[in-house]
C-alpha cells in the first residue's frame, strides 16, 4: 500500500516532518522504499545528474517516462511524483492535462509536479479537476533558470517575497496537495508554511518547511565538482565507487581476479573426455 496524499496532509497537521528524495532507476527506488521514504520524486533533475545536460530544460516526456516506469517498478510503498518537463504544460491547461495523464496512465505515477505559481494556477486546477494530484514548485524554478539569470536565491526583496506568497496561495486555491519551496530565505519559507494548509517541501528553504526533498546524487556524494549549499552529504559514494573500480581494474590487470572462487568448473570425467575430443 502506497503513501497517500491524505497521509502527507495529516503529517503536516501532526507536525511530522516529511522526508522526500529523488530516484531515477529501479534499484534506487527499492532502497528508498526499504528505508521508509514516504514519497519519491522522479525529478527532471535527472537531466543533469543522470543524462549530463547543463540544465533541466532539455529533458523530454520520453526521458521522464523511461525513468518513471523504472522507479514505479522498484517501489511498493512510496507515493511516486513525476516532474513535468519544460514546455509540456506551458501552452494551455489542455496540454498540461494530457501530459499529466500520460504520467499516470503510461508511467504509473500517483501525482505530478510542475513549476510556477500564479502563472500556472489554471493548469494546476485543470489537472486536479480531472482527478490527478498536483504538487506545486515555487522559488528557484530550474526550468526558468535562463529567465532567473542562474541558480540564485529567490524572494530576497519585499516585492519578490510578496509575489512568492501570492504564488503559494494561488497554488493552494487551485488544488495543489503540496508545494516545493526552493532556494529562498528560511524566514520567507516559514511565513509561507504557516500561511497555507497544504504541506511545504523545502530544498534550500530552511527548517520550518513541513518536509524536505533532496537530489539523491547530491546527498550521497556522487559528484565532486559541485556541492549545493543546501545539501548535506550523508555518504561519499564517489570516493567509495572510485576506490572499488580501481581495485577491480588492478586485480584484473595483474590476474588476481577472477579466482577459482568466482569460476565454474567441469566434472573431471567430462573434462577428460572433452580433451580427447579436441586435443
Curated annotation (Swiss-Prot):
Protein name per Swiss-Prot or TrEMBL: 3-methyl-2-oxobutanoate hydroxymethyltransferase
Q: Which PANTHER family match?
A: 3-METHYL-2-OXOBUTANOATE HYDROXYMETHYLTRANSFERASE (PTHR20881:SF0)
Binding positions for 3-methyl-2-oxobutanoate per the UniProt entry: 44-45, 83, 113
Positions that bind Mg(2+): 44, 83, 115
Which one Pfam family would you cite for this protein? Pantoate_transf
* Organismal lineage: Bacteria, Bacillati, Chloroflexota, Dehalococcoidia, Dehalococcoidales
Keywords, comma-separated and alphabetical: Cytoplasm, Magnesium, Metal-binding, Pantothenate biosynthesis, Transferase
User: What EC identifiers does the entry list?
Assistant: 2.1.2.11
Instruction: Give, as in the UniProt entry, the pathway in which the protein acts.
Output: Cofactor biosynthesis; (R)-pantothenate biosynthesis; (R)-pantoate from 3-methyl-2-oxobutanoate: step 1/2
Provide the cofactor list for this protein: Mg(2+)
Regarding protein family, the annotation reads: Belongs to the PanB family.
**What does this chain do?**
Catalyzes the reversible reaction in which hydroxymethyl group from 5,10-methylenetetrahydrofolate is transferred onto alpha-ketoisovalerate to form ketopantoate.
What InterPro entries does this protein map onto?
Pantoate_hydroxy_MeTrfase, Pyrv/PenolPyrv_kinase-like_dom, Pyrv_kinase-like_dom_sf
Q: How does it assemble?
A: Homodecamer; pentamer of dimers.
Task: Write one Gene Ontology MF term.
Answer: magnesium ion binding
Localization, per the record, is:
Cytoplasm
Amino acid at each position: 500500500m502506497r503513501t497517500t496524499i491524505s497521509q502527507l496532509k495529516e503529517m503536516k497537521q501532526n507536525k511530522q516532518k516529511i522526508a522526500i528524495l529523488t530516484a531515477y532507476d529501479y534499484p534506487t527506488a527499492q532502497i528508498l522504499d526499504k528505508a521508509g521514504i514516504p514519497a519519491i520524486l522522479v525529478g527532471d533533475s535527472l537531466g543533469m545528474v543522470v543524462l549530463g545536460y547543463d540544465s533541466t530544460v532539455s529533458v523530454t516526456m520520453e526521458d521522464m517516462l523511461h525513468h518513471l516506469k523504472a522507479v514505479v517498478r522498484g517501489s511498493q510503498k512510496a507515493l511516486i511524483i513525476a516532474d513535468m518537463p519544460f514546455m509540456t504544460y506551458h501552452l494551455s491547461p489542455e496540454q498540461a492535462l494530457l501530459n499529466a495523464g500520460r504520467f499516470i496512465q503510461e508511467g504509473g505515477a500517483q501525482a505530478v509536479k510542475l513549476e510556477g505559481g500564479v502563472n500556472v494556477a489554471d493548469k494546476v486546477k485543470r489537472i486536479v479537476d480531472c482527478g490527478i494530484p498536483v504538487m506545486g514548485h515555487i522559488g528557484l524554478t530550474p526550468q526558468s533558470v535562463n529567465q532567473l539569470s542562474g541558480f540564485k536565491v529567490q524572494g530576497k526583496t519585499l516585492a519578490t517575497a510578496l509575489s512568492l506568497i501570492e504564488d503559494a496561495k494561488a497554488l493552494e486555491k487551485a488544488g495543489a496537495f503540496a508545494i516545493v519551496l526552493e532556494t529562498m530565505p528560511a524566514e520567507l519559507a516559514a511565513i509561507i508554511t504557516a500561511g497555507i494548509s497544504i504541506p511545504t517541501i523545502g530544498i534550500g528553504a530552511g527548517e520550518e518547511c513541513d518536509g524536505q526533498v533532496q537530489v539523491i546524487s547530491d546527498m550521497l556524494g556522487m559528484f565532486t565538482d559541485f556541492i549545493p549549499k543546501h545539501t548535506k552529504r550523508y555518504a561519499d559514494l564517489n570516493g567509495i565507487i572510485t576506490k572499488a573500480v580501481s581495485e577491480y581494474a588492478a586485480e584484473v590487470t595483474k590476474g588476481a581476479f577472477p579466482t577459482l572462487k568466482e569460476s565454474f568448473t567441469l566434472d573431471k570425467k567430462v573434462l577428460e573426455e572433452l580433451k580427447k575430443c579436441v586435443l
